[in-house]
Amino acid sequence: MRISVETRFRCPCCGYKTLDAPEALGLCPVCWWEDDGQEDKDASDVRLTVNGALSLAEARAYYAQCGAAHPRFLPYVRKAQLTEQ
């Protein structure tokens, strides 16, 4: 069952509405960040969980530079759809 765009949640890395639920380890197809619950208050912390040694702050910087949470994810990402903005 697909969740409608209206009920989707914003990715903490790229900001697009691509996640079915917050903090549910959803993988964003736009930036390839896996939502582990990290937020602005701890964005510079490295949690060493599903995102490895990558902090949310680093992932955001990479996304701004290259369009993915890390350059190694570039083959997997896609552009955001208008409905995800």
Where are these regions (language model features)?
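Short, charged low-complexity linear motifs
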Residues: 12-21, 44-51
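Residues immediately within or flanking Cys/His clusters that coordinate Zn2+
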Residues: 8, 25
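Compact nucleic-acid interaction/catalytic patches
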Residues: 27, 38-42
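Short, intrinsically disordered terminal segments enriched in charged and Pro/Gly residues
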Residues: 1, 41-85
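Short, non-ligating residues that shape and space the ligands of small metal-coordination modules
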Residues: 20-21, 35-38
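Short cysteine-rich clusters marking metal-coordination/redox-active sites
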Residues: 11-14, 28-31
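Metal-centered catalytic cores of metalloenzymes
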Residues: 9-10, 16-18, 81-85
